[in-house]
Amino acid sequence: MQHKLLINGELVSGEGEKQPVYNPAMGDVLLEIAEASAEQVNAAVRAADAAFAEWGQTTPKARAECLLKLADVIEENGQVFAELESRNCGKPLHSAFNDEIPAIVDVFRFFAGAARCLNGLAAGEYLEGHTSMIRRDPLGVVASIAPWNYPLMMAAWKLAPALAAGNCVVLKPSEITPLTALKLAELAKDIFPAGVINVLFGRGKTVGDPLTGHPKVRMVSLTGSIATGEHIISHTAPSIKRTHMELGGKAPVIVFDDADIEAVVEGVRTFGYYNAGQDCTAACRIYAQKGIYDTLVEKLGAAVATLKSGSPDDESTELGPLSSLAHLERVSKAVEEAKATGHIKVITGGEKRKGNGYYYAPTLLAGALQDDAIVQKEVFGPVVSVTLFDNEEQVVNWANDSQYGLASSVWTKDVGRAHRVSARLQYGCTWVNTHFMLVSEMPHGGQKLSGYGKDMSLYGLEDYTVVRHVMVKH
């Protein structure tokens, strides 16, 4: 397995402390990788800064060609990437290969095209004898911090728009799941000029802090927890860096009495538990209207009970393990606290799986109240709660009564209600009669403590640019 860092176009071994990388399906160590040293972090940023002088002035066509080549290489090595992701994350291999790899390839191809469409406004004469124009220029060096739930996907979401806009990137994948990013580094080094892409390995304290705090870094892009986002914003405040934050969510799933209950059950069974629920948009916080509540709980409980946990290599496996032992304990603790309320009922699941690996049973909890922790706090595991509501006004208020604001869904046959409720929800995305549908052309990003900035779409590309005014006297 490729375990070297990419710095200035060369694969080099880390010079810092070695860290174990685990196989969560078995709970054993896959390998140990040496972190980047402080000197190597500095070297990576300096290399990116030096490369920016030329890369930032390349034509959109040239940048697009590099991105398309990278997309092709990922596609050609799709099986290799899927196997690495499966071993390092515990994802079912068939899901990694069939769902994630095509989406990752599409992200690079989308931004290759978008790079050639980015422009500033052609302005005019707002002062006699002077012509103004607006430019959208790259910022410089971008430090990108990727999470452990979708390691390669999130690396793509960060690399593609930043590079398309003309920036140079230093990427730090999670120390828990670095293998696909390091493999990507190996393939990218022969496509992009030296220094344009750099990939480091290490923990937040030893590598993340010196990277994000480096004076030559102009922007920091993070997908991670609220706590990590707070830390980076505070850490980078003295240098006034631009920050781009995607910090998780607790998606409300609003089910009205007139909803297609079979569609709701199928949707939540799939999108509440996909990737073992380790998804910031997971359909995890159901609000069911009183007329449909009992039926939904019964049917959804039966459906969730059929979800198959197992080996990532098994074609029939739907749920793999959680990412780490520490995360397994966090999920288990959240469910135990919910049980202890006395009014929350475990419909199915609610326990760790016996045997090797970090498995938690797919869980459905009914009877949750608005102020319960299981409703208000992100669990990030295969755990879905159901809360009863009376009317539209109440459920909109409850849905918005959350520190999160990333994703939501509304299930109803009433088109007017769908538009009305969607307009009032304080979430970056609202799906109607579906959930978890993502396309490269549409923006993904939240509000409130879920963060700010957009991934994907032309809005995502613009986030990696600076708007400049040029005035010419004539």
Swiss-Prot record:
Record's keyword terms, sorted: NAD, Oxidoreductase
Instruction: Cite the active-site annotation.
Output: E246, C280 (nucleophile)
Function text: Catalyzes the oxidation 4-aminobutanal (gamma-aminobutyraldehyde) to 4-aminobutanoate (gamma-aminobutyrate or GABA). This is the second step in one of two pathways for putrescine degradation, where putrescine is converted into 4-aminobutanoate via 4-aminobutanal. Also functions as a 5-aminopentanal dehydrogenase in a a L-lysine degradation pathway to succinate that proceeds via cadaverine, glutarate and L-2-hydroxyglutarate.
Q: Which GO terms describe its molecular function?
A: aminobutyraldehyde dehydrogenase (NAD+) activity; NAD binding
Pfam families given for it? Aldedh (PF00171)
Subunit structure of this entry?
Homotetramer.
Biological-process GO terms, alphabetical: L-lysine catabolic process; putrescine catabolic process
**Binding positions for NAD(+) per the UniProt entry:** A146, P147, W148, K172, P173, S174, E175, D209, S225, I226, A227, T228, C280
**Species whose genome carries this gene:** Escherichia coli O127:H6 (strain E2348/69 / EPEC)
EC?
A: 1.2.1.19, 1.2.1.-
The protein here is known as: Gamma-aminobutyraldehyde dehydrogenase
* Family of this protein: Belongs to the aldehyde dehydrogenase family. Gamma-aminobutyraldehyde dehydrogenase subfamily.
Q: What else is known?
A: 4-aminobutanal can spontaneously cyclize to 1-pyrroline, and 5-aminopentanal to 1-piperideine.
Give the pathway listed in the UniProt entry for this protein: Amine and polyamine degradation; putrescine degradation; 4-aminobutanoate from 4-aminobutanal: step 1/1; Amino-acid degradation
Q: Which reaction does it catalyse?
A: 4-aminobutanal + NAD(+) + H2O = 4-aminobutanoate + NADH + 2 H(+); 5-aminopentanal + NAD(+) + H2O = 5-aminopentanoate + NADH + 2 H(+)
Per the record, the coiled-coil ranges are none
